[in-house]
């Protein structure tokens, strides 16, 4: 039987938010015990700003809703530029303002295997979606979407790396994650 919390299980496997040459294989092996769970992978360019913000916001929303044992939530990058780096300090501070911790995060790159393992691959902008499709060899199962599309919006999540506006990114991520959680829990 799978442990109650997939996050704790990934920590026990020694791979939660760690980047090694074997981390993607280890994540895949650990996720096999969670076949009945909703698996979400948030994706951005570097996995240090928007996608980890979405990962930790969604984990917090899921925890608040008492559904921790129904979801596996992670994040990844489309690029290799920031591999192994922690959450960008201003993002860490923005999360902390809202009582959300992101300790131990290390950026990792999305792989084709993630397409098989996760039911939902959520990009932050159109370029992310394009790169996700390239990495995965397309999106034949329709698993890839933009975060804000779940909130009925056609725009991209503001990228604070360029804008410096971490509050705007927080607002976008919060709106998108709340809408996504509502959508997914209504399906169950």
Each predicted region: which residue ranges?
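Short, Lys/Arg-enriched N-terminal segments with co-localized hydrophobic residues
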Residues: 16-36
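Conserved active-site segments centered on acidic
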Residues: 31-117, 182-188
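Cationic, low-complexity basic patches in intrinsically disordered or flexible, solvent-exposed regions
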Residues: 12
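Extreme N-terminal basic, low-complexity initiation segments
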Residues: 2-9
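Phosphate-binding/catalytic loops
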Residues: 120, 126-188
